[in-house]
């Protein structure tokens, strides 16, 4: 009996001793700073200049690659990029055959939105894509990658950006089957011809696998499989319309997004009698969330918002959006279409014509990026949605979006617009965004309707909205209207 107990212990010890004997890197279990004294001992460098203790990667394909293999580790870097610089931190990868996809890649890219690669720093590329700017060019930032068992965490400036647990039988698209964890090399590489990446501090803590091997076996559901497949295609799965309402916190929202494989845009309600109602409250709000790993969005409430803010202040948001659910009818009555006692429908057809005209006026007059809660009609008309949204009315809305370069939201909560409307808009060249418009802390969904639309309408990455660079924001180019639109 004692002999049987000893055998497993001896086997484990043999494995550990074997690993240590083969391992030729920094001391396991301790944090080692990589500097000029030990750089050549542990790392192979290519086209890297060392100046005053800093590593400069200026040439395309400049790299720092480990001479040792690791599976579990903690790696932290203090870095800076100059404009145009893009790179990758690869792990579980190979020293050779860089053209083949093996292991995982963390993106380093601090360019403005819609400039170059859409994936930004902290993105676990093709697995948990991050499209949100987490750092800026010409500023030092901290990047940390942790691999423990089958868990991967990527943090930027102490904010968790990408989080992934690799299933034991990870499903990968053709050509990506090598994208799994293994004991292999780590490499920092520059992938762009322009700009420079600078590393001023690099620390690594190797972890002997057996000390930390807690592999979680779990089954993904069909929806998670769809999301994983879209992430592997680098489809931008972004919910641009999330609110911190009903007790929902920023940490809860970000955790929900990471767990489900997409990004969030968190919107402030800005307008008359709302918490954000002038430049001062707007700037205070933005200063409070500036470090959060979310898109910063402005929901323009009512029609009066154009009189309350300056374009310069509004341009602090990554994008702005509005709906056509609040306006004044031809009898001078103020309508809020989601409120039955504040909605007046004297004649169905006249109401729909008036609504269509209001949508056109809002899109023509207000410098918004996205039309949200689109095609929403009052509760008493919703059963006749397909009848009332005629081809002529749909065409008018689509044309208004096109001529003003406004994206059309696909709303996961209301499940609008209809597939027919979306197909018509796609054929015309309209861009799309996804949004939930949650009202409670427990009604964030998993973008089910949006995923259905991707399949049924054949949406691709090229069909999707991305925020404009700051210099190209509509609010700065178009300004605000001189009169309220509705």
Where are these regions (language model features)?
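Extended substrate/RNA-proximal surfaces in nucleic-acid metabolism proteins
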Residues: 278-403, 455, 480-485
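Structural recognition of the beta-strand scaffold that forms the well-ordered cores
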Residues: 105-108, 264-266, 295, 321, ...
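An N-terminally biased module of ancient metal coordination in phosphate/nucleic-acid-related enzymes
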Residues: 221-304, 378-387, 396-397, 435, ...
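Charged catalytic cores and adjacent phosphate/nucleic-acid-binding surfaces used
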Residues: 220-233, 385-486
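N-terminal Sec-pathway targeting helices
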Residues: 1-13
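Conserved, mostly hydrophobic/aromatic
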Residues: 241, 320, 373, 408, ...
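Short, charged, surface-exposed secondary-structure boundary motifs
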Residues: 116-118, 275-276, 329-333, 442-446
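Carbohydrate-interacting regions of secretory-pathway proteins
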Residues: 18-221
């Amino acid at each position: 009996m004692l002999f049987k107990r000893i055998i497993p212990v001896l086997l484990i010890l043999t494995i550990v001793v074997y690993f240590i004997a083969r391992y030729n890197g920094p001391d396991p279990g301790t944090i080692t700073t990589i500097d000029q004294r030990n750089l050549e001992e542990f790392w192979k460098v290519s086209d890297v200049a060392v100046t005053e203790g800093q590593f400069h990667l200026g040439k395309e394909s400049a790299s720092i690659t480990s001479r040792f293999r690791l599976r579990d580790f903690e790696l932290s870097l203090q870095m800076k990029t100059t404009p145009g610089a893009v790179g990758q931190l690869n792990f579980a990868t190979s020293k050779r055959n860089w053209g083949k996809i093996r292991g995982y890649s963390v993106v380093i890219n601090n360019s403005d939105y819609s400039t170059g690669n859409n994936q930004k720093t902290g993105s676990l590329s093709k697995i948990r894509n991050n499209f949100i700017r987490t750092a800026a060019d010409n500023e030092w930032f901290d990047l940390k990658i942790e691999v423990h068992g089958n868990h991967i965490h990527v943090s930027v400036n102490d904010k968790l950006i990408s989080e992934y647990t690799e299933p034991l039988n990870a499903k990968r698209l053709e050509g990506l089957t090598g994208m799994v964890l293994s004991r292999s090399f780590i490499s920092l590489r520059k992938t762009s011809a322009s700009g420079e990446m600078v590393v001023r501090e690099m620390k690594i803590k190797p972890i002997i696998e057996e000390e930390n091997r807690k592999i979680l076996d779990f089954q993904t559901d069909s929806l998670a499989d769809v999301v994983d497949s879209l992430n592997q295609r680098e489809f931008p799965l972004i919910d641009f319309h999330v609110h911190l309402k009903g007790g929902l916190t920023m940490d809860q929202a970000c955790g929900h997004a990471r767990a489900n494989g997409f990004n969030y845009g968190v919107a402030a309600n800005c307008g008359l009698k709302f918490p954000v109602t002038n430049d001062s409250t707007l700037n205070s709000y933005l200063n409070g969330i500036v470090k959060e790993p979310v898109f910063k969005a402005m929901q323009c409430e009512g029609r009066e918002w154009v009189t309350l803010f300056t374009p310069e202040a509004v341009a602090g948001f990554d994008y702005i959006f509005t709906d056509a659910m609040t306006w004044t009818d031809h009898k001078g009555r103020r309508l809020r279409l989601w409120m039955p006692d504040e909605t007046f429908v004297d004649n169905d057809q006249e109401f729909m014509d008036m609504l269509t005209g209001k949508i056109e006026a809002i899109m023509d007059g207000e410098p918004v990026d996205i039309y949200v809660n689109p095609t929403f009609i009052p509760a008493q008309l919703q059963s006749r949605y397909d009848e009332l949204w005629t081809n002529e009315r749909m065409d008018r809305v689509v044309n208004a979006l096109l001529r003003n370069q406004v994206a059309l939201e696909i709303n996961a909560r209301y499940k609008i617009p209809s597939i027919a409307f979306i197909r018509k808009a796609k054929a015309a060249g309209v861009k799309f965004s996804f949004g939930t418009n949650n009202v409670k802390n427990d009604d964030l969904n998993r973008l089910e309707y949006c995923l259905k639309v991707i399949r049924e309408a054949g949406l691709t990455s090229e069909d999707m909205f991305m925020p404009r660079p700051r210099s190209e924001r509509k609010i700065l180019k178009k300004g605000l209207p001189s009169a309220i639109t509705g």
